[in-house]
Amino acid sequence: MKLGRAGEVLPFSLKSRVEDVPMTNPEELIGAAHAGCFSMALSSLIEEAGKVPGTVETSAKVTLEQREDGFWISEINLITRGSNQDLTSEELVALAEKAKSTCPVSKLYSS
């Protein structure tokens, strides 16, 4: 599968859902898109607040469930870590909450 403007090729396989193989799957790509979008939204909000974003890193844990009617993504949990001396914990949490409502991928999943 080719991704992005540069045409990066990623090995793509059904096996990656259940085995430890060096390939990816749709669920991992969805999680990566959500995590990346959220980090970008949060960094932008930090800059808009007149602060220096520092480091913002987000990872996603995508839960895939098998139900009677097939597989479903039941939830995506984002874990964000950052380093910024300009923000209090309270300010960062408030901006992260706002990022949840401004990140386009978060909007998609909340609709």
What label would you give each PLM region?
Residues 1-32, 39-111:
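Extended beta-strand/beta-hairpin segments
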